[in-house]
Amino acid sequence: MDADDSRAPKGSLRKFLEHLSGAGKAIGVLTSGGDAQGMNAAVRAVVRMGIYVGAKVCFIYEGYQGMVDGGSNIAEADWESVSSILQVGGTIIGSARCQAFRTREGRLKAACNLLQRGITNLCVIGGDGSLTGANLFRKEWSGLLEELARNGQIDKEAVQKYAYLNVVGMVGSIDNDFCGTDMTIGTDSALHRIIEVVDAIMTTAQSHQRTFVLEVMGRHCGYLALVSALACGADWVFLPESPPEEGWEEQMCVKLSENRARKKRLNIIIVAEGAIDTQNKPITSEKIKELVVTQLGYDTRVTILGHVQRGGTPSAFDRILASRMGVEAVIALLEATPDTPACVVSLNGNHAVRLPLMECVQMTQDVQKAMDERRFQDAVRLRGRSFAGNLNTYKRLAIKLPDDQIPKTNCNVAVINVGAPAAGMNAAVRSAVRVGIADGHRMLAIYDGFDGFAKGQIKEIGWTDVGGWTGQGGSILGTKRVLPGKYLEEIATQMRTHSINALLIIGGFEAYLGLLELSAAREKHEEFCVPMVMVPATVSNNVPGSDFSIGADTALNTITDTCDRIKQSASGTKRRVFIIETMGGYCGYLANMGGLAAGADAAYIFEEPFDIRDLQSSVEHLTEKMKTTIQRGLVLRNESCSENYTTDFIYQLYSEEGKGVFDCRKNVLGHMQQGGAPSPFDRNFGTKISARAMEWITAKLKETRGRGKKFTTDDSVCVLGISKRNVIFQPVAELKKQTDFEHRIPKEQWWLKLRPLMKILAKYKASYDVSDSGQLEHVQPWSV
């Protein structure tokens, strides 16, 4: 599918939420199967969006069991009943495995209970089993109604009035085992738990020179194991979809001993709980420990993470994902017709899509069938593009071929960090260095940005030099905001001295400006006529050409965690409003998305101009809120959203206007947003996007092999980014037109579309464009 195949219609054809009404409709929301962090955010979004459009929304407690039992298990929800649940793990409405719903009698009871409350729209949050059950229920619905009418439990009018059941699913599962969706609700939070444990284990393992075998959950899906192995640079990983080849025991022991010989003091082996060999026999953690102890004599420990992975606070990513999906689910139910198949709302790249539920379920079952029949390549293919990409990247970075097996290109590729530090930069450098070495290049590290480049702070960097960099925050190479413009002569001299054939720049808006300056200097300095590519890395997420930047997710999690603590403080004090200032320069990404993830009442950003009337409206909104049971407020403000409406001004205005109703406090989060260990998302995004950048450089250098060609075309100076569903290389010359240089932001930003969501979920009226919604797509199998 192309990135553009669901563009919003133009002009009068645009469709807004106001055009959809839920009046007279009743929506039932339930969570079923294993719990997952973020389910509460989804429940909150469904309830609030449902109420916003005028529908009645009911909680169905304890999953399908509550639907079968009826009575107090089905209760109407109101706005306040989903307050303060965003930051809570698990599901507040409970989940239970239900045998009764598997029988027709059970489903008959469930139908009767729903009809008593007029519910003909179901929003099911759960795994493939729960969603398959919902689809069967929908198919049987008319038959169940007729049976209830024959039994005298409902009249003929009710059969006609409630003739159709609409079902929309959201996949809540930490395993990420549902085909058709890139990320299921809960997966990112589970990765956070795993990486927290791995980071903690690494310190003790290094102290004692130990080997740790970590078993992670995921049933028959290796996603958690694979991505956590990628995020922590594990020595070996065992997956159900890609079993190790015959003789793996010896290969693994050789790999572990080689790593020890390179002065690595610890080994990490990650095992998926469903790991198997090529004969479909289980590979257990204990078996691996036994092997390492007997063959190598290493001090080895096994850690089984278990249900820790299901627990804890949802990550910012899961809260935003679940909120987006919950809103999309309500819109899908409002737009459903009797002919619409049951669908799943999901994420494809950065794009919300609807997919036919049974197509997804079928493909998910096909993966298991392929594994049972030992067609492992098919299993990886069916898991999708993201899974296959992660697997290939892991293999490239984990296993170093002997030097004599790597064909040398005689090319020197330099890596530089530019701008402010961002968590994940080191993961990106590690990935670039290792992929470059595997491709036969000589890799050079430039220290301290363009300043260091001009001074000749350049050294060769090897495979082992970047070991253990993935989990390190900040920038090990050192980074500065200095632009190359005033050092062009010196930098050209260094390019010539070190025979640099290509340049990879990892950084923020300064890196983008630097790339433009180097590109413009090509006519004067032929040394710059080499392939140059930039990978966006900044907490501000303000680089043109990419929807995401390395470091923004970690900053968002820092903001979200801090807001959770502040909200807790405000809840204890009662009648208190907090004003939080976030970073980002003129870019409101952190304030807006932080507001969505933390459940803020307002977020002031530069991209949406505001005046004193808007501030007054916010005060009135908070005054009304204090009359309810939720007696606290949270307001986010981007640091450069307004020259005059500063954080101090807003604090003073709120303090004065709120006198006698609420008091006010302010917090400036500052540079804590740039620090800390990178989140799993930033580690993996940095790792994968940097590997892609090096593949591009290698392909460009192959064009010139032996010919000494100079690169002068625009397509040899690019920014690599994610746009909607695709990873794309865009020439900086083209991106100039899309850039607001004065305010250092792109002219168009995708996340502004989500701005109304934050307002709606905070009880403001807002105009939400739903033109992109409504296209039911088909699941596309991907070929490896």
From Swiss-Prot:
CDD domains: Eukaryotic_PFK. Homo- and heterotetramers. Phosphofructokinase (PFK) enzyme functions as a tetramer composed of different combinations of 3 types of subunits, called PFKM (M), PFKL (L) and PFKP (P). The composition of the PFK tetramer differs according to the tissue type it is present in. The kinetic and regulatory properties of the tetrameric enzyme are dependent on the subunit composition, hence can vary across tissues. Interacts with ATG4B; promoting phosphorylation of ATG4B. The gene is PFKP. The keyword S-adenosyl-L-methionine does not apply. The modification Phosphoserine is found at residues 6, 12, 21, 142, 386, 783. The modification Phosphotyrosine is found at residue 651. Its main location: cytoplasm. Residues 412-784 are annotated as: C-terminal regulatory PFK domain 2. ATP binds at residues 34, 97-98, 127-130. Pfam families: PFK. Pathway: Carbohydrate degradation; glycolysis; D-glyceraldehyde 3-phosphate and glycerone phosphate from D-glucose: step 3/4. Residues 400-411 are annotated as: Interdomain linker. Substrate binds at residues 173-175, 210, 217-219, 273, 301, 307-310. Catalyzes the phosphorylation of D-fructose 6-phosphate to fructose 1,6-bisphosphate by ATP, the first committing step of glycolysis. GO terms for biological process: canonical glycolysis; fructose 1,6-bisphosphate metabolic process; fructose 6-phosphate metabolic process. Allosterically activated by ADP, AMP, or fructose 2,6-bisphosphate, and allosterically inhibited by ATP or citrate. The active site is at residue 175. Keywords: Acetylation, Allosteric enzyme, ATP-binding, Cytoplasm, Glycolysis, Glycoprotein, Kinase, Magnesium, Metal-binding, Nucleotide-binding, Phosphoprotein, Transferase. Glycans are attached at residue 540. One of its GO terms (cellular component) is membrane. It is found in: Cytoplasm. This is ATP-dependent 6-phosphofructokinase, platelet type.
